[in-house]
Curated annotation (Swiss-Prot):
Protein family membership: Belongs to the NAD-dependent DNA ligase family. LigA subfamily.
Function recorded in the entry: DNA ligase that catalyzes the formation of phosphodiester linkages between 5'-phosphoryl and 3'-hydroxyl groups in double-stranded DNA using NAD as a coenzyme and as the energy source for the reaction. It is essential for DNA replication and repair of damaged DNA.
Catalytic activity: NAD(+) + (deoxyribonucleotide)n-3'-hydroxyl + 5'-phospho-(deoxyribonucleotide)m = (deoxyribonucleotide)n+m + AMP + beta-nicotinamide D-nucleotide
Name this polypeptide is given: DNA ligase
Binding-site residues, Zn(2+): C412, C415, C430, C436
Gene: ligA
Catalytic EC class: ligase
Binding site for NAD(+): D36, S37, E38, F39, D40, S85, L86, E117, R140, E177, K294, K318
Length: 678
């Protein structure tokens, strides 16, 4: 019986190997060596044999690509080694500067060997293989933590569930890009349009949306593909000497690798490679938005090192934004939190690089005058960096003879208050302050934001309703709303009303730094707010400070000091602050005074690993309360590394930079001494 089981197991494994070889030939090499009907017959045979054998079906069997129930969420997973992004350049001069910096650092007298490859426009992914078997796939996320999308990635036919080798590494994380080929994208949108469903703006969005489907069977139908271009954690595997050799190793393992990469041994060769990719761009079967250049030798990569969020040994040279022509149908004005009145062009919809553009900021009246932009004009528009719509110029030959010259109105379009403009500022501003509904909404959104009072559940739509119903004029009014007020809002149930009231009540307990930031003083971001709180230690002292006293603080220049002084000179602002404090918003003055002497004040801290009792969010909040700035990457500017269990590459980098290491116990000690008044 045991012998029969062994024979059956061997037969099953041989059949699986045969099918894997055919999958690789079909999906990766695009050179099928059997007919579709023959492949289907092999799959049917494998399913039947697996069912009849009674043996456990391994996770890497070709029959296990699609299946499983729909999930209602994606689990967050921490990357063992951070997934860094790349710095960008946008022209030959900037690229030449990058190349010269590398040459000075690595080899002043000889050329540097680079690899040029397409910058794929998709979704970065980390594939973790353990003993050759795909165990987990996770998105980049914020570079530190991503989402577990393993079940969906298993449905992508170009990604092997098992590496094609008898001697796989114990662990290897293969990094690359999941993308949607243009052909699949067009077919998907055609089908969606025929069904009356929402269409995707571009292949990148389609790839991202398809990968994050809760039902893996939907992902399986979306024809996603993958290219490898890097690595993460590796155990029991010796990297080859060059990146080019690693790609060859991936290819041998049946990991898809783009064949378009090319060597560039000199700066002129690198410039030529960029031009070649730019010419090929439109003809490629997948979207690219630039060219990535990497140092070929891994030893040279290690010597070049890393910046805070990107490697020094690689750069992404983005393509110039694609330009199209369209027509300006109207110029509307938007009013922001600080009263800035921004003209916005409403455009005849135009598709640029797969994205429908309907509007573009014109920034200010001076910019409109400089470009002589008028309603009715035909204009060239591009997506700067392939992202932000930008009006480049006007096609004067197509201008209508009666096209009116734009003039900034004298009064705010929202509240009718006077629009004012300082001579030294390009931005015009509404003088209405919190009397202006548009400024009121923006100020309330800022006040409730995560870095300010962090009022959970109080979003833009809810704030707009409160302002429209005239329940709220200033942030102080939020703390006076009753259950009846909340219940009277459209679609506001009792539970939702209770939740938001609870969140508002919880937000009363805050820190002086958060409160200062929440006030929305022009030029005072979260970092400046922390510095101001630490310096003055008391709200009254901060409000009484003159411009000279403010400028003693690092980061507070003459302009910001003047803005702070102007803010507190307004009696309405002072009245709102008094009302907020009277409503119960408070912080520990003793804590703020203690923090001035705290060892973490003004320090940069990185967290790595799993802490014994605190979550990462809790630890970060305590660090920030104690005056620290928490960042995600270790650099020479890092002051402390907060170390937990199962730390990744950050520990090694911290040791290389001689960064002092602290643990949760040390943080708890500081918290007990400096922060327990919160």
């Amino acid at each position: 019986m045991a012998q029969n089981s062994s024979l059956i197991a061997a037969e099953l494994e041989a059949l699986r190997q045969t099918i894997r070889a055919h999958e690789y030939a079909y999906y990766v090499l695009e050179a099928p060596n059997i007919a579709d009907s023959e492949f289907d017959a092999l799959m049917q045979k494998l399913r039947a044999l697996e069912a009849a054998s009674g043996l456990p079906i391994p996770a890497d069997s070709p029959t296990q690509r699609v299946g499983g129930k729909a999930d209602n969420r994606f689990r967050n997973v921490a990357h063992h080694i951070a997934m860094l992004s790349l710095d960008n350049v946008f022209n030959a001069d900037e690229f030449a500067d990058f190349y010269r910096r590398l040459q000075e650092q690595l080899s002043p007298t000889t050329a540097i060997s680079l690899i040029a490859e397409p910058k794929f426009d998709g979704l970065a992914i980390n594939l973790r293989y353990e003993n050759g078997i795909l165990q987990r796939a996770s998105t980049r996320g914020d570079g530190i933590t991503g989402e577990d999308v393993t079940q969906n990635v298993r449905t992508i036919s170009t990604i092997p569930l098992r590496l094609n080798t008898h001697t796989p590494p114990d662990v290897i994380e293969i990094r690359g890009e999941i993308y949607m080929p243009k052909k699949a994208f067009y077919a998907l949108n055609e089908q969606a349009a025929a069904n009356g469903e929402k269409i995707f703006a571009n292949p990148r969005n389609a790839a991202s949306g398809s990968l994050r489907q809760l039902d893996p069977r939907i992902t399986a139908r979306r024809q996603l593909a993958f290219f490898a271009y890097g690595y993460g954690e590796i155990t029991n595997y010796q990297l080859p000497e060059t990146y080019e050799a690693l790609l060859e190793q991936y290819r041998a393992w049946h990991i898809p690798v783009c064949s378009l990469h090319q060597k560039a041994a000199t700066l002129p060769e690198a410039l030529a490679a960029y031009q070649q990719f730019a010419k090929q761009r439109e003809q490629l079967p997948f979207d690219i938005d630039g060219v990535v250049f990497k140092v070929n030798r891994f030893a040279d990569q290690q010597r070049a090192g890393f910046l805070a969020r990107a490697p020094r040994w690689a750069i992404a040279w983005k393509f110039p934004a694609l330009e199209k022509t369209t027509r300006i149908e109207a110029i509307e004005l938007q009013v922001g939190r600080t009263g800035a009145v921004t003209p916005v062009a409403r455009l005849q919809p135009v598709t640029i690089a797969g994205v429908v553009v309907r509007s573009a900021s014109l920034h200010n009246a001076r910019e409109i005058a400089r470009k002589d932009i008028r309603v009715g004009d035909t204009i060239f528009i591009r997506r700067a960096g392939d992202v932000i719509p930008e009006v480049v110029s006007v096609v004067l030959e197509k201008r209508l003879p009666d096209a009116p010259v734009f003039a900034m109105p004298e009064h705010c379009p929202v509240c009718a208050a006077a629009i004012v403009q300082n001579e030294d500022e390009a931005v015009a501003r509404c003088s209405g302050g919190l009397h202006c509904p548009a400024q009121r909404v923006a100020a309330l959104i800022h006040f409730a934001s995560r870095e300010a009072l962090d009022i959970r559940g109080l979003g833009e739509k809810l704030i707009q309703q409160l302002v429209a119903q005239e329940f709220v004029r200033t942030p102080a009014d939020l703390f006076c709303l009753t259950a009846d007020d909340w219940a009277s809002l459209p679609r506001m149930g009792k539970k939702s009303a209770h939740n938001v009231m609870t969140a508002i009540d919880a937000a009363k307990k805050t820190t002086l730094a958060r409160f200062i930031y929440a006030l929305g003083i022009r030029g005072v971001g979260s970092v400046n707010a922390q510095a101001l709180a630490a310096h003055f230690g008391d709200l009254a002292a901060f409000m009484a400070a003159d411009r000279a006293a403010l400028q003693e603080i690092e980061g507070i220049g003459d302009v910001v000091a003047a803005d702070i002084e102007h803010f507190f000179a307004d009696e309405d602002n002072r009245a709102v602050i008094a009302a907020i404090v009277a409503a119960g918003v408070h912080w520990s003055t003793e804590l703020t005074k203690k923090i001035i002497d705290a060892p973490l004040l003004g320090k940069t801290v990185v967290i790595t690993g799993t802490l014994p009792s605190l979550s990462r969010a809790e630890a970060q909040k305590r660090l920030e309360t104690l005056g620290a700035k928490v960042t995600s990457q270790v650099s020479r500017q890092t002051d402390f590394l907060l170390l937990g269990a199962d730390a990744g590459s950050k520990l090694a980098r911290a040791q290389a930079f001689s960064v002092p290491i602290i643990d949760e116990a040390q943080l708890q000690t500081w918290w007990q001494h400096y922060g327990n008044a919160v």
